[in-house]
C-alpha cells in the first residue's frame, strides 16, 4: 500500500477497517487543498460553529507550510518540494515508484503552483476570520499573502509566465526550467495571483505553443522544443 512509500509519521493505520490514511511526504499541496475544501463546505452549510472549531487547525497547517524546514525555504521565502513534474507526486529518481519520502539528499525545488495555492489559502483564511469577526487576524493573513506574492513574482515570474521549478540544492536535468510552461500556470490565474495583463500573458503563451508543437499538450514542451517541432 501507499503507506509503505512514506515514513511512519506520514500515515495512520486503521487495522480494524483494513484502511490507512497516508500523506505522501513529498507533496506540498495538502494543507492548502484542505483549506480550499473547507471553503466549499462552509459556503454550502454556513455552519459558523463548525468553522470556529476547524479554523485553528486550518491555520496551523498553513503556518506549518510557511515555517517547517522540510516545507519552507527561508532564503527565498517560498514553499519547496522534491523535484517533481509540476504538482505530481513522484520524482525522476530510480526509486520513485516506491519512495515518496523527503530524504536529506532529496533534490529540492520551488514550484509556483504550491505557492499560489498557499497564497490562495492565506486569503481564504482571512475571509474565514472576517466572517467570524476576527478583523485583526484577517488582516494579518492578507499581509502575509502579499509578502508571499511578492516572493513568487521575484523568483518565479519570467515576464511572461511562471517558470516550472527553481532548483535549490541541485542543477536539475537540463537548462530549460525558465522556459518550461507547466500546467499550474492556469491554477495561478484561478487562485487570484495574477492581474489581468499577467493572466493574458500566460494564456497567450499557451495559445502560441499550441500552434508551434505537436506534443500531446502545449504545457508539456519548452519553448525550444516547440521551435524544434516547427523546424
What are the functions of these language-model segments?
Residues 84-91, 171:
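Alpha-helix boundary/capping detector
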Residues 1-81, 111-115, 119:
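Aromatic-rich carbohydrate-recognition surfaces in CAZymes
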Residues 69-81, 110-111, 117-229:
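Catalytic cores of carbohydrate-active enzymes
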Residues 27-30, 85-87, 181-185:
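Short, solvent-exposed loop/turn segments at the edges of secondary structure
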Residues 88-103:
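A short, charged helix-loop
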Residues 49-52, 105, 135-136, 208:
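Polar/charged alpha-helical tracts
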Residues 18, 100-111:
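Flexible glycine/proline-enriched surface loops and loop-helix/loop-strand junctions
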Amino acid at each position: 500500500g501507499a503507506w509503505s512509500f512514506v515514513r511512519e509519521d506520514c500515515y495512520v493505520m486503521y487495522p480494524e477497517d483494513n484502511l490507512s490514511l497516508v500523506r505522501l511526504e513529498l507533496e506540498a499541496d495538502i494543507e492548502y487543498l484542505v483549506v480550499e475544501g473547507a471553503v466549499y463546505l462552509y459556503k454550502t452549510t454556513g455552519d459558523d460553529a463548525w468553522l470556529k472549531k476547524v479554523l485553528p487547525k486550518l491555520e496551523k497547517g498553513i503556518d506549518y507550510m510557511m515555517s517547517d524546514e522540510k516545507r519552507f525555504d527561508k532564503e527565498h521565502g517560498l514553499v519547496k518540494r522534491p523535484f517533481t513534474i509540476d504538482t505530481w507526486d513522484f520524482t525522476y529518481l530510480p526509486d520513485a515508484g516506491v519512495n515518496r519520502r523527503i530524504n536529506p539528499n532529496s533534490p529540492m525545488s520551488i514550484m509556483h503552483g504550491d505557492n499560489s495555492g498557499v497564497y490562495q489559502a492565506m486569503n481564504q483564511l482571512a475571509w474565514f476570520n472576517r466572517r467570524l469577526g476576527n478583523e485583526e487576524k484577517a488582516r494579518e493573513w492578507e499581509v502575509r499573502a502579499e509578502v508571499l506574492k511578492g516572493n513568487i513574482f521575484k523568483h518565479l515570474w519570467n515576464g511572461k509566465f511562471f517558470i516550472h521549478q527553481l532548483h535549490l540544492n541541485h542543477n536539475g536535468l537540463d537548462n530549460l526550467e525558465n522556459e518550461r510552461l507547466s500546467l499550474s500556470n492556469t491554477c495561478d490565474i484561478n487562485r487570484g495571483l495574477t492581474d489581468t495583463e499577467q493572466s493574458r500573458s500566460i494564456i497567450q503563451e499557451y495559445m502560441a505553443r499550441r500552434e508551434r508543437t505537436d506534443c500531446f499538450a502545449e504545457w508539456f514542451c519548452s519553448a525550444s522544443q516547440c521551435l524544434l517541432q516547427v523546424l
